[in-house]
A protein has these predicted regions:
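Amphipathic alpha-helical segments
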Residues: 8-19, 80-94
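Acidic-leaning, charged glycine-interspersed low-complexity segments
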Residues: 83-122
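Oligomerization/assembly interface segments of phage tail-like spikes and tubes
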Residues: 58-72, 110-120
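Short, conserved charged micro-motifs
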Residues: 73-81
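Short histidine-centered beta-strand/loop micro-motifs
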Residues: 51-57, 77
């Protein structure tokens, strides 16, 4: 079983290696008004959907949330990014769970779409 640090490295490397995706890829964060957009934020969730900060061994069922932030009016670019995310995540063995959720982040005036992914860590 991989540690969370190994899973995080594997995910970041796969996302960063895709030349179609933006290079602004961050782990557990929230963009600010001065951040460069579009950007991707990824977080590992624990068994009940909360944030997991541990570097120890994780459960066999790993859940990742990917948040894509784009400027207002840039939904077409968001769709392209999300489709590329699907390709990357399927390639490294994750499957999409649930439907994407889309929000307006009023404090930074950006649109955010969250998707969740699951992988068996065996």
């Amino acid at each position: 079983m991989k540690t969370q640090a190994q899973l995080r490295t594997e995910l970041y490397s796969a996302l960063y290696a895709n030349t179609t995706l933006p290079n602004n890829i961050y782990w557990i964060g929230k963009p600010t008004i001065t951040s460069t957009f579009p950007c991707i934020i990824y977080t590992f969730l624990d068994d009940i959907g909360g944030y997991a900060f541990s570097d120890g061994l994780v459960s066999e069922d790993v859940t990742v949330q990917l948040d894509v932030y784009v400027d207002l009016g840039d939904q077409a670019n968001m769709d392209i990014i999300v489709n590329e995310l699907k390709s990357v995540m399927y390639t490294i063995g994750y499957r999409n769970i649930g439907q994407p959720a889309e929000f307006l982040e009023a404090d930074i005036q950006k649109i955010m779409r969250a998707t969740r992914w699951e992988k068996w860590n065996v």
